[in-house]
Amino acid sequence: MTGFETFFTTVMGFDMNNLAFEVGFDHYRLDLHLEADRFEEADWEQVQFGFQAAKQQDVSKLRCNKFESKVLSIRSRCLKSGLEVAITAKDLMAELEITNGLCPITEEPFTFAQQNLTDWSIDRVDNTRGYVPDNIAIVSVKANKAKGDSDLPHMIEQAVRKHNPNSTLTQKQWFLMGRFYYERLTLTETLNMTAILYHSPEILFKVIVMQLYYPNTKHSHVFSSILAPYCPKLLIERTIKLILKRYKTGKVAPRSNHGLNLVLNSPKALDAIFILMMRVLEHYAEFDEILTVCFFKLPPDVLDIEYSKPV
């Protein structure tokens, strides 16, 4: 500890390792005014001490950019919550670059400091952890507010709902949110995906059909291998051939390019898919993990596809 630090710590009563002290110090360093109403009364004294310490040291002032400002804003908010803050402006710069300027949830361009729902914001991927480099993502204010304290099952439940009048996000945006966090979260337990899809049979239908429509993907192979002991292999193979044959012969409803209406317009294929759905539901525990993978591999637009009436 330097003589300066010893003086301010032991004589003046400053706690230089205190986050409130650091926040005050950085306010001076970044040439920002202190506003008492932004801090809790219990932190205000240490914030002022930090500001005065920087002033006494005649710390060189820096021009505050949006990254420095955002980090300081987060650190200030975390004085009350007690969350860990270990991110830097460089971490935010790297995360923003990954987005290419678009919110990965709403797919809308970011705005900055405009007090809009499209403004950029920093979200904690895992709500139980703090602001550390491997636990942050840049999303819009709109997406961040919609997520709130939601866990992954809640996001999926929103994604499979056809219409939620109380939601600020579309069904597709909920799907993109679920996929975004699914790829970043470390799951410690199953999501009970089969149970979620049981209450949305239309989505379960789409998930299963897509495995037959694109049978050569890795996840489709896994799905078929789990299904095989409970369903005649010949039934699976014939259903795949039937779907592909109808596609090649042009027996498909206009604008239906995902195989869904191909099945609806074929009584044989429809009966086969119904059998497969029943087998999945009967052995739900074995399908939970692969159904989650298959669900998030769906093209987002598939969720919005309306079925055509059989011809």
Residue ranges and their predicted role:
Residues 1-2:
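Generic N-terminal leader segments that precede the first folded domain
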Residues 275-311:
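Extended, amphipathic alpha-helical scaffolds
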